[in-house]
């Protein structure tokens, strides 16, 4: 593989504690990884050269929460919600019906389209979930489709109890035959621990069964109200608890005292007209915070991590640096991919070469110029995937 030197970087955000934020910087990409970082004046020769011409550069976005194996459209539900109808997660069943009716090829094409859409906006690492099949066969095929395209795959058979099914009998199915069918194709298991979905005991059963099969744990929790999601995630050592819209002080303290990441999904809260999470309370308490898109056809149909960063800065009292770290390193931490060989969400020698250059001299422009497309050029695994 050829090497590339990206030089003339006006401001380089690395997320590395030793390197920090550099000015007039350069980096070298070789064999899909970062090979060197330092001053532009000291940049070594490479096979190819890209002059950033004073633009800002940073790690590619790490989107640690999406639902991209789906078919169909829920525009009517969105319009009804904007007209005052409350969001209660019931529309998931609409997507389940459409997804079951779609072919594998149709699901794969839709997934690839959304990953490409995200990449054009700077996202270089994507987690996605099953959860719109809710039968053994449909969850398995969703997992297979996702594993062929996404960086990380999560089993979410416990997304909703299918219409007409008994909740406890469905949990039995998820914990047994369904998990056995999908486990070879996924790295994670998630559960929607919320009123109207799965209670704490049911959620614990699913997560315990997944852990016994060697899967990492994640939780949808505290989206529609206070509840047991955060406490359960911390108790079981889940890598992340996602949404965190409604938190008690004990929830905040529990997250701050644990390795569980609080993954915030502001685009979802805006779309469902929920309050935005209290990111400031979490950060001030010492919790690790991630930002993710929650891209899905119902409650958050956006792949724009930049939009989430902008919202976090303008509406959630996060600084630009905090929001960028949450959307890169934080997402990587939520997937346990922030350290070691082939790390993402960070720029340092040895890390995966996922780099985005902005059409801006500073990352502050992500919030300073809201709504303006600022992605200039993107490299994923050292390969230039988009650029002006």
From Swiss-Prot:
Keywords: Cytoplasm, Histidine metabolism, Hydrolase, Iron, Metal-binding, Zinc. N-formimidoyl-L-glutamate binds at residues 132, 296, 298. Its main location: cytoplasm. The keyword Phosphoprotein does not apply. SUPFAM superfamilies: Composite domain of metallo-dependent hydrolases (SSF51338), Metallo-dependent hydrolases (SSF51556). Its EC number is 3.5.2.7. Its cofactor is Zn(2+); Fe(3+). GO terms for biological process: L-histidine catabolic process to glutamate and formamide; L-histidine catabolic process to glutamate and formate. GO terms for cellular component: cytoplasm. Belongs to the metallo-dependent hydrolases superfamily. HutI family. This is Imidazolonepropionase.
